Amino acid sequence: MAGAQVADLGRFLERMTSEPFVDGATDCILTVADWIVLSGHPDPAEPFRGRYRTALGRERIVRREGGLLAMMQRGADRASLQQTASPRPGDVGLVSMSGLELAAICLGTRWAAKGSGVVVAEPEKIIRAWRV
């Protein structure tokens, strides 16, 4: 990852930490999509951005999309992201943390996901990752 992008990631994580979790605005899915857009790619969340404001609305969209993995894969395709088996800081993925599947940003061995604040942990499993 280029030096400028490292600095941008640091600033982005600070912003992630300071903003409350809000379904349809700053949830784990849209936060990762925001990072992808900030990194210069098309918006992977464009088809559903602004279409939900509650946890129930989010769950309905995820279910309609065929699950979070299918939803993220289509978003990665829209943003022209390539799948990677060796994620680097700044890459994104679907990870399993504490038994939950979360959209997250790679920090190295740990990943950051939007919760109430930011959850930073080593995932139990990297389900799929994409190069940003």
Where are these regions (language model features)?
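Glycine- and charge-enriched low-complexity intrinsically disordered segments
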Residues: 121-132
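...with weaker cross-activation on analogous glycine-rich loops/strands in unrelated enzymes
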Residues: 56-119
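Intrinsic-disorder/low-complexity coil detector
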Residues: 43-46, 86, 122
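N-terminal capping segments
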Residues: 1-62
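Bulky hydrophobic/aromatic packing residues
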Residues: 34-40, 69, 106, 110-112, ...
